[in-house]
């Protein structure tokens, strides 16, 4: 059995893309009129990282941002600062993985 979840960019609503991390914070401009309210990240050049999810209901703020790893049964982690709000998208902080290529899906 298989299941497929397909995502697409819809201008001003959602953004699909990729980003290369280098150890420095990076702003991901999604073209939103306000910051992202949902962010899904997955590393593509390594199997060591899972599916990371942040959402505004749990809190995407400057400071600690709760996240879930979808591929585990673990509880929400609440004591990390891996992403921050950015006027038209989100910022991946330098506290997150220091390298790698990541795909993302963000919703305004």
Regions found by a protein language model. Give the residues of each.
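Surface-exposed molecular-recognition determinants
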Residues: 1-108
């Amino acid at each position: 059995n298989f299941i497929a979840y397909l995502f697409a960019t819809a201008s001003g609503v959602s953004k699909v893309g990729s980003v290369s991390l280098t150890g420095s914070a990076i702003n991901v401009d999604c073209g939103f009129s306000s910051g992202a309210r949902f962010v899904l990240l997955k590393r593509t050049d390594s199997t060591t990282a899972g599916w990371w999810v942040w959402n505004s209901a749990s809190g995407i703020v400057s400071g600690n941002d709760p996240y879930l790893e979808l591929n585990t049964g673990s509880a929400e982690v609440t004591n990390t600062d891996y992403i921050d709000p950015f006027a038209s998208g989100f910022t991946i902080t330098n506290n997150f993985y220091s390298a790698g290529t990541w795909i993302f899906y963000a919703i305004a």
